[in-house]
Each structure stands twice: as C-alpha cells, then as structure tokens.
Amino acid sequence: MSKPAKKAASKPAKKETKGFTAEEREAMKARAQELKAEARASKNRAEGESAALAAIAAMKEPDRTLAKRVHAIVTETAPGLVPKTWYGMPAYAQGEKIVCFFQSAQKFGTRYATLGFTATAKLDDGAMWPIAFALTKLDAAEEARIRALVKQAVG
C-alpha cells in the first residue's frame, strides 16, 4: 500500500499594502529604524545632530538650503532642543517629544517644504491656531517669524 502524495507546500501570498503611498511606507520604515537606533543609542545630542545634518545633506535643492537655514534658526533660537530625525526628516525634540520638524517638498511631491509643530509646541492661541507653515524661500521676515514661533513653542 502506498502513502498518499504530500501536497507541495505553498508560500502564503504576499499581501499588498493598501492605503499608504510608497513615500509614506518609506517614511514609516525610516521611523522604525530611528526608533531602533534610539533604543540602542545613548540618545546624545551629537548623534542626533549628525543624523539631522545627514538627512539635510541628502535633500535636493532648494529643500537642502531651506532645511539648513531652518536648522540654524532652530538651534540658535532654542539651544535646549535636541536635533534628531523623525520619519527621515530633521526634527527638534524637548526631552523625548518632538516640538518641530522640517519636511522637504520632494519627500511627498508637494510644491513647498513644511515647517511643522507637534502638540508639544506651546503655540495655542484661542480655539484655533496653525501648526504647519509652507516654505518656498526664507528671507529676513520669514526667519524672524520662525524665531518667534520656535521661542513660543518651547515656552
């Protein structure tokens, strides 16, 4: 009597990720890597600064120039904020919480870069206030506004 033939083991079908763009999936992967690195690292300022500057250096123009300038403004205005990356973009944290971040236009195919603030930022102004700002260029007026926003954000 012969044994019944075994069915060939089939690999489970690869699930297609729906709902997220390739850029969003890339950003989530970058964030997962950042979380792992933070867990392993001592989370010192030099490591965060290095990661933020590397993210800026990887950007194309004009985002690179905008990000360099925003980085300089934030670090001069609020030296207590620690530079790091957040979803692959330069960000600035108070303790473990991100206060503000720069998002390049090219990352998500938008026509402007973004300076954003999280709920940690103390920007509250009545019942409604902006938390993100489009950037296409920086002159003295925009730089002064960013300085004021960062000062207010850290309280």
Model-derived regions: residue spans:
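Charge-dense, helix-prone N-terminal extensions
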Residues: M1-G155
